[in-house]
């Protein structure tokens, strides 16, 4: 069972919490804080649009899959890329995805109700009683 705190104690606690939050905000804004991530497992900085991209040397030009990829990834990549309508973009993923599928947008087939009729088509025969 928690004991009720006096308003002075509550105000002091709130002030300390707010000071701590303000300090963390300043550290984050300044880029000084380390979130406990080692350099090996930090995500790369996001690239802004319009900036030139750098090519990862782990990917061979024209081959399409990383040289450090597992044999399972290579064996899945080669037949898949040759038998699909789309193509694959190789990537250096921290999540285990060695390539991203890119599928083309296909126009839907027209339904029979919306198919235009040709002007030279024979008239339909209606039998009336």
From Swiss-Prot:
GO terms for biological process: DNA repair. Residues 105-129 are annotated as: Disordered. It comes from the Eukaryota. This is SOSS complex subunit C homolog. It holds the Pfam family SOSSC. One of its GO terms (cellular component) is SOSS complex. Belongs to the SOSS-C family.
């Amino acid at each position: 069972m928690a004991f009720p705190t006096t308003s002075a104690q509550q105000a002091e606690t709130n002030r300390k919490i707010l000071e701590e939050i303000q300090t963390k905000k300043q550290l984050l804004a300044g880029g000084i804080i380390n979130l406990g991530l080692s350099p090996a497992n930090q995500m790369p900085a996001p690239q802004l649009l319009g900036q030139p991209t750098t090519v990862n040397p782990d990917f061979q030009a024209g081959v399409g899959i990383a040289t450090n990829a597992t044999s399972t990834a290579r064996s899945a990549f080669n037949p898949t890329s040759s038998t699909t309508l789309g193509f694959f973009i190789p990537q250096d993923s921290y999540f285990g995805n060695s390539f991203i599928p890119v599928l083309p947008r296909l126009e839907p087939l027209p339904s029979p109700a919306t198919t235009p009729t040709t002007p030279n088509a024979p008239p339909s025969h209606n039998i009336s009683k």
